[in-house]
From Swiss-Prot:
GO MF annotation list: dynein intermediate chain binding; plus-end-directed microtubule motor activity
Cited function: Acts as one of several non-catalytic accessory components of the cytoplasmic dynein complex that are thought to be involved in linking dynein to cargos and to adapter proteins that regulate dynein function. Cytoplasmic dynein 1 acts as a motor for the intracellular retrograde motility of vesicles and organelles along microtubules. May play a role in changing or maintaining the spatial distribution of cytoskeletal structures. Also a component of the nuclear pore complex.
Lineage: Eukaryota, Fungi, Dikarya, Ascomycota, Pezizomycotina
Taxonomy, superkingdom: Eukaryota
CDD domains named in the record: DLC-like_DYNLL1_DYNLL2
GO CC, any one term: nuclear periphery
UniProt keyword annotation of rRNA-binding present: no
UniProt main location, coarse: cytoplasm
Subcellular location field: Cytoplasm, Cytoskeleton; Nucleus, Nuclear pore complex
Species in which this protein is naturally found: Emericella nidulans (strain FGSC A4 / ATCC 38163 / CBS 112.46 / NRRL 194 / M139)
Quaternary organization: Homodimer. Cytoplasmic dynein consists of two catalytic heavy chains (HCs) and a number of non-catalytic subunits which present intermediate chains (ICs), light intermediate chains (LICs) and light chains (LCs). Component of the nuclear pore complex (NPC). The nuclear pore complex constitutes the exclusive means of nucleocytoplasmic transport.
Name assigned to this protein: Dynein light chain, cytoplasmic
Length: 94
């Protein structure tokens, strides 16, 4: 059953400045968040708190279907991807 959800949530990386390992971790955390929560704010909060805990502060996360962005981020700490119809922007600042 869990593999069915993961199959539906195939990540599509749109823009990235992040190691392969961290990209994979970001996708895995996002999948966990989307399995636990259905409200975009709650999904973003889960991802942000997980990355703050695992990788150190300060991470920012935006989750949604229709938004524009232009951000400054630490080198090697940025990813923008889709899981299903939901866009996820995750980045770290100093």
């Amino acid at each position: 059953m869990a593999s069915e959800k993961k199959d539906k949530l195939e990540p599509q990386i749109k823009s990235v400045d992040m190691s392969e390992d961290m990209q994979q971790e970001a996708v895995e955390v996002a999948i966990e968040a989307m399995e636990k929560y259905h409200i975009e704010k709650d999904i973003a909060q889960y991802i942000k708190r997980e990355f703050d805990s695992r990788k150190g502060a300060t991470w920012h996360c935006v989750v949604g279907r229709n938004f524009g962005s232009f951000v400054t981020h630490e080198t090697k700490h940025f990813i923008y991807f889709y899981l299903g119809h939901c866009a996820i922007l995750l980045f770290k600042t100093q």
